[in-house]
Every structure is written in structure tokens, then in C-alpha cells.
């Protein structure tokens, strides 16, 4: 740390127009008066995020990034500034320097260098996508070919080094936010690498360059130069990971090697770093343009001036906060182009679905409504895409490491999953780490579901995320699969809004009855009906929506025809009608039985003869009914006796109207009241009293005549 503190006086002497560093709590801030105006910088330290958020850049909070700005050289020597760390930083060796510096600035990578380790650099712009392929070999070159230059690196305790550089180009079209070079070094621990590995991945989008460094030296980062060939030196480790800390070390030798076997460095703009620094470089040091990697400039001047130039000062630069949510809102999203690029990824996935590898690097970025996935194969076995073949900028690599030529399906699964999740609206694009971890394994589960039949379609059940959608077969084509992905997104969104359960509710109503359009179906109430044995049963067992068997009502009254025509009558009303009709049938049966009994009695008692009927005595009814006793009405016709009515008395002393009893005796020779027989003896008995003199009658003339 002593050599860092010695640089501060030189910094103030060289840049007299800049204020001394204030040291607020949590970060460093400075105000720089420059010809482009005052710019404020604030650097803070935050803990590093999880792997998913680091690799896919889904963090939603605003974050600060380290930035390096090109500062015009004020010394005549033109040497590039060197890294310096303030004494207030944590007291642990983060960066050591020596006479020999490793150049890490914009030099175009030589695509013709021999390599056993390769990387793919993909460039996205509004006009199209350019692919730059370059290979670097860290093991097959001799020592001492590193061009001296400035190497700016930052070490963090949690295994992530993040530097966000901004080349402030006043003549640029896109202003301050465009010409910037972003570097993020991520050390991912694994157990499959048994040897040092390194590769570099650059991505240029909207005049932005991102460098993914997995090289043994701190791979060309911001504003530094890289030779066409890198050498793999096996003496001193540059990056070492112990207890979660990463240390970047420049040794006094040109032998630099990455010796940690379980490390892998990926680049991504991060919002959480434990330590951040900002450095400034001269315009000559940065040659990054809108569509190219920083090309090598003034290499000879650098080599001459490096030894004689004094130590330079690294000054922080003011930078406005950048958040992924702001970028998502400001950048338009072009779904059509995104689908086309997704088709490219599916074609690549189909080619390598039989292979496997666990450690893969995925870099996904959004650019002008497009999002593409940049992948880096740790075994350095190249996968040539169709777009790369068309551009003729990438050639298949040979001599890949034995046993490391398989690409794992989970890599492609994660890549395709990113497309599916990213196609959502900007509001739902930012997922937490838990959502990523839950969604990644469920979208694409391997080749078993890829082999499903082409007739199958995507199905989404409400509220069941565990039901994974089945992909169409390879015969359906990648374009159809991509369209199905978009349909799946729409289904998920409507599912959250509650539309899918409503559709399923309509399906139930339509399938339950042919009369689903009738309004009464939704208000049908349960009712009960009588079966053939007069037992109550639930009509729901007969039909769900009043689709009953109308043959049960064939023998009912005519009113049921109306009920049959109007099927949406209240079921309770139908129940009452059915019950009443059953009771009526029972009454008719009872009456028929009684009639049958009466017929039997009539047959047993033959009718009386006409003579006997005519011989019945007749009585004239008086006003006081004294002639007929206490009877007030006729038992047959139930009519009251009135004056001057003719009544007849049977031998059983029951009085009836003469016409009524005559009709009855013609049908049955019994008394209607007591069922007593009316035999001919009755006639004889009636004739005998008629032969005897009536005591009440006046004496006859004979008796009167005999009296004298």
C-alpha cells in the first residue's frame, strides 16, 4: 500500500485543475473541471450477488459501476496512467505493480493466431450482427512478448472485479452513455477444470464494448493494448481465489498464469461489488469505436514512453447511476427480431442436444429491442452458428482439448429459458434470484420432452407451475417452437390475470349440456323426483342440466306437455306436478277397486221383482214428518222430505222416496242402508196387512150392515 500513497502527490502535481479526493463514508467522490463540463462520480461498495443475477444481469436496483474515463494527457511523454489505490482502501494487497506491465487496452485480437482455447465475440448493432472470432493461446508461446502498457484491474473480496469505463467522446452521436467499455470479471468456482484456462469474450452493442475475461493475464480490459498473441506462462498465478477473495497481482516477471483450477471468469455489468475503483486514461489509450474492438494505437510510443514516464495518477470520475430497469424502459423491444434470433439458438440447440458439459458461460444482453445470448465454451470447442458462417468471420477451431467437446443440455436450456422469460413486459422482466432458480429447471427439462409428437400443443393448467410444457418435436421446426414460446408467455400472463380459469368455466358449461346458452342453466336448483316405485331420487343423478328422460311423464296430465316444451321451468315446480299426478293416479286406482267390490255385491244380490217393488206401501209426507218418523231426508238422493212427497217404507223400516227406492231395487234387492234382503216374503208380508182390516180405517159397509 505504500506505493499507492506515493502516487497521490504526483497526481496532484500533474492534474492541478482537479480537486483533492474527498473521502465520504461508503465511497469516493470528486469534482473534475474539464472542458466538457463538471462531472461527479460516486463509488460505493456492495456485496456481490448470486450467480444467476451476475450472469444474466437481472438485478433491478440502481447500482453504481466503476468507470474509467479518457483524460487528455498533460505530460509530454504521453504515457498511460497507472493504477493506484487510495490508502483508505482495505489493507490487503489487491494489485501489485512492477516494471513490466501487462497491456490491457484496445488492440484488435488476431483471428489467425493458433490456439487451443477460443472465444466468440458477438457484436450486435441496429443494422445487423457482426461476429468476431478470435483465438488466443496461453500455453504455446514463448515468454516476454507482452507489450508494456497500463493494466487497470480491481480486486474484490467476494470474487468479482467490476470496472465500468466511459470514453467520453464529444463528437459521438450517442453521447456519454454510448462509447463505454464495460468489464466484469466473475470468478466461478467449479470442480471440472484441472488446468489453467482462459478466454475472452467481447460484445459490442450500441457503441458499447464489454469484455469477458477468462484469460490468464487480466485480459484486454478498458483502454489498454493487447498483443496479437498471448503467452501462457506457468510461473506466477495472476488470479487466485482463496476464501472467497480474488487478488490481481502484477509480478516482476512476465510469467503470468492463472493457476486456480476451479475458476472461470465471465464478464457482465454488475451492481454489487465489494470494492470498486475508477481510473482515467488518455484519448490515445482508447480506440474503441461503435462497431469494433479497440484497435492497437501508438504501440511504439507506449513502448518508448513507458520506461521514462513518471507514475500516473488514477482519479475517480463522476458518473450517473445506471440501472437495468432504466435501460429496459429506455430501450425499445423488437419482438420480431428477437424471435428470429431465438430461432437461431434453437437450431444450434438441436445440433448439440446429445452432448453435455457442466461449466458454460452465458452472456445475455438486450440491444435495441433485441436480446441475444453469447456463449463461451470452456473446453474451447467452437460451435459455429449460421450467422457466423454467413459473415465468414469465424472458422471452426481444431485441436480442442480432448474430452471437453461436449456441450451440456442445461446450457441450452438456460439459454432458451432466458428468451422465454425475457419476452415478457419490462415490468415483469426483472426477476429475483429465487424466481430464476425456480424457473430455469422447469422450462426445458431435457431431450425426453423434446421428442414429443408434433400434434401436441402447449398446455397451461391454472395455478400449477409444476406441469411443465412439452416441446414439439424436431419435425415441427424451430420457427414453430419459437411461436409456441410466445404463446406460452401469453398464457402465463393471462393466467396471472385470472383469464384461464374463466375459459375453463365456460368449457364446463358448454360440455355439460347441449343447451348451454340458456340462462336458466346457471341458476338450476337441485330437486327430487319420484321413480317408478314412488321413491324419492335426486334429479341430478338423471341429468346435470335438466336433460331428463321425458318418457317418465308420458302418462301424466296434458299440462306436462307445456313443461316438456319449456325445459327451463323451475325444477321444484316440475317436482310438485309430478307428485300431484302420482297421487291422482293412486286415487283412481282406489276408486276402481271400490267399484269392483260393488259389482261383486250386485252380482251376489239379484234385483227385486217389479211386482214386489210396486207392492211397497206408500206414505204421504206431512208437514210434521209424523208419517215417516224422524227421517229428514232420503238416504239415496240425500234430499229432504217436503210436504206431499210420496215415501215408501221397506220391511226394515227405512224410508225412501218412492222413485229412488224403486230404481235401487231394480239393481239390487237389498236395502241401501242396512243391506238387508228384499225377498218376496216381504211382498207377502205387505199383502197380509192389506187383507187384515185396518184399525184406523173406517168400518166398511159390510160391517155396518151386519151390525143391525
Swiss-Prot record:
- Zinc finger motifs (RING-type), residue ranges: 634-675
Reaction(s) catalysed by this chain, per the record, are: S-ubiquitinyl-[E2 ubiquitin-conjugating enzyme]-L-cysteine + [acceptor protein]-L-lysine = [E2 ubiquitin-conjugating enzyme]-L-cysteine + N(6)-ubiquitinyl-[acceptor protein]-L-lysine
Q: Where is this region: Disordered?
A: 1-30, 53-90, 244-342, 385-411, 425-495, 685-708
What SUPFAM superfamilies does the record tag this protein with?
RING/U-box
- Membrane topology of the entry: Peripheral membrane protein
List GO terms (cellular component aspect).
centrosome; cytoplasm; endoplasmic reticulum membrane; Golgi membrane; plasma membrane; postsynaptic density
What are the start and end residues of every segment in region (Interaction with PRKAR1A, PRKAR2A and PRKAR2B)?
A: 531-708
- Enzyme nomenclature, EC number: 2.3.2.27
Residues of the region (Mediates interaction with TBC1D31) are 550-570
Q: What is this protein called?
A: E3 ubiquitin-protein ligase Praja-2
Q: What does the organism's lineage look like at the top? A: Eukaryota, Metazoa, Chordata, Craniata, Vertebrata
Gene name of this polypeptide: PJA2
Amino acid at each position: 500500500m505504500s506505493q499507492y500513497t506515493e502516487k497521490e502527490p504526483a497526481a496532484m502535481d500533474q492534474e492541478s485543475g482537479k480537486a483533492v479526493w474527498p473521502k465520504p463514508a461508503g465511497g469516493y467522490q470528486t469534482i473534475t473541471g474539464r472542458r466538457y463540463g463538471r462531472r461527479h462520480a460516486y463509488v460505493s461498495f456492495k456485496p456481490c450477488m448470486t450467480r444467476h443475477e451476475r450472469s444474466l444481469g437481472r438485478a433491478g436496483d440502481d447500482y453504481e459501476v466503476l468507470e474509467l474515463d479518457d483524460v487528455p494527457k498533460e505530460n509530454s511523454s504521453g504515457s498511460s496512467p497507472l493504477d493506484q489505490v487510495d490508502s483508505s482502501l482495505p489493507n490487503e494487497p489487491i494489485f501489485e505493480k512492477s516494471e513490466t506491465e501487462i497491456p490491457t487496452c484496445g488492440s484488435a485480437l488476431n483471428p489467425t493466431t493458433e490456439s487451443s482455447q477460443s472465444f466468440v465475440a458477438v457484436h450486435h448493432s441496429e443494422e445487423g450482427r457482426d461476429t468476431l472470432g478470435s483465438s488466443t493461446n496461453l500455453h504455446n508461446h514463448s515468454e516476454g512478448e507482452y507489450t508494456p502498457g497500463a493494466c487497470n484491474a480491481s480486486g474484490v473480496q467476494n470474487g468479482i472485479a467490476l470496472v465500468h469505463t466511459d470514453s467520453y467522446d464529444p463528437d459521438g452521436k450517442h453521447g456519454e452513455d454510448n462509447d463505454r467499455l464495460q468489464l466484469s470479471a466473475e470468478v466461478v468456482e467449479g470442480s471440472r477444470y484441472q488446468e489453467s484456462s482462459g478466454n475472452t469474450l467481447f460484445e459490442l452493442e450500441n457503441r458499447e464494448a464489454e469484455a469477458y475475461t477468462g484469460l490468464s493475464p487480466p485480459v484486454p480490459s478498458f483502454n489498454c493494448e493487447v498483443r496479437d498473441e498471448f503467452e501462457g506462462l506457468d510461473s506466477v498465478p495472476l488470479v487466485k481465489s482463496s476464501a472467497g477473495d480474488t487478488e490481481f497481482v502484477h509480478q516482476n516477471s512476465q510469467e503470468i498464469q492463472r493457476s486456480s483450477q476451479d475458476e472461470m471468469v465471465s464478464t457482465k455489468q454488475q451492481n454489487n461489488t465489494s470494492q470498486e475503483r475508477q481510473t482515467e486514461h488518455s484519448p490515445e489509450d482508447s480506440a474503441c469505436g461503435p462497431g469494433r474492438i479497440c484497435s492497437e494505437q501508438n504501440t511504439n510510443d507506449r513502448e518508448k514512453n513507458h520506461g521514462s514516464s513518471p507514475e500516473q495518477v488514477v482519479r475517480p470520475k463522476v458518473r450517473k447511476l445506471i440501472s437495468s430497469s432504466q435501460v429496459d424502459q429506455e430501450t425499445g423491444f423488437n419482438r420480431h427480431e428477437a424471435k428470429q434470433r431465438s430461432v437461431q439458438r434453437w437450431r444450434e440447440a438441436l445440433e448439440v442436444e446429445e452432448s453435455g458439459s457442466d461449466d458454460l458461460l452465458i452472456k445475455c444482453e438486450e440491444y435495441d429491442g433485441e436480446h441475444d445470448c453469447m456463449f463461451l465454451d470452456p473446453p474451447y470447442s467452437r460451435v459455429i452458428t449460421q450467422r457466423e458462417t454467413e459473415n465468414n468471420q469465424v472458422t471452426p477451431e481444431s485441436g480442442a482439448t480432448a474430452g471437453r467437446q461436449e456441450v451440456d443440455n442445461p446450457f441450452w436450456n438456460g439459454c432458451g429459458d432466458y428468451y422465454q422469460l425475457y419476452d415478457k413486459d419490462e415490468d415483469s422482466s426483472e426477476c429475483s434470484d429465487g424466481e430464476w432458480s425456480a424457473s430455469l429447471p422447469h422450462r426445458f427439462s431435457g431431450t425426453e420432452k423434446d421428442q414429443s409428437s408434433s400434434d401436441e400443443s402447449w398446455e397451461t393448467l391454472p395455478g400449477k407451475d409444476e406441469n411443465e410444457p412439452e416441446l414439439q418435436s424436431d419435425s415441427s421446426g424451430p420457427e414453430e417452437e419459437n411461436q409456441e414460446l410466445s404463446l406460452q408467455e401469453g398464457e402465463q400472463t393471462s393466467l396471472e390475470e385470472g383469464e384461464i380459469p374463466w375459459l375453463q368455466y365456460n368449457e364446463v358449461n358448454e360440455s355439460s349440456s347441449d343447451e348451454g346458452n340458456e340462462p336458466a342453466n346457471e341458476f338450476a336448483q337441485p330437486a327430487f323426483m319420484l321413480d317408478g316405485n314412488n321413491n324419492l331420487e335426486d334429479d341430478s343423478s338423471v341429468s346435470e342440466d335438466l336433460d331428463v328422460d321425458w318418457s317418465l311423464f308420458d302418462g301424466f296430465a296434458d299440462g306436462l306437455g307445456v313443461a316438456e316444451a319449456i325445459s327451463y321451468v323451475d325444477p321444484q315446480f316440475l317436482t310438485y306436478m309430478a307428485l300431484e299426478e302420482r297421487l291422482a293416479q293412486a286415487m283412481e286406482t282406489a276408486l276402481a277397486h271400490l267399484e269392483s267390490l260393488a259389482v261383486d255385491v250386485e252380482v251376489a244380490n239379484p234385483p227385486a221383482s217389479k211386482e214386489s217393488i210396486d207392492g211397497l206401501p206408500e206414505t204421504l209426507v206431512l208437514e210434521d214428518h209424523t208419517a215417516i218418523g224422524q227421517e229428514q231426508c232420503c238416504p239415496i238422493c240425500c234430499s229432504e222430505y217436503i210436504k206431499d212427497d210420496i215415501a215408501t217404507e221397506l220391511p226394515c223400516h227405512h224410508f225412501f222416496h218412492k222413485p229412488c227406492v224403486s230404481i235401487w231395487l231394480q239393481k239390487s234387492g237389498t236395502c241401501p242402508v242396512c243391506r238387508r234382503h228384499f225377498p218376496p216374503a216381504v211382498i207377502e208380508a205387505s199383502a197380509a196387512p192389506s187383507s187384515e182390516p185396518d184399525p184406523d180405517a173406517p168400518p166398511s159397509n159390510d160391517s155396518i150392515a151386519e151390525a143391525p
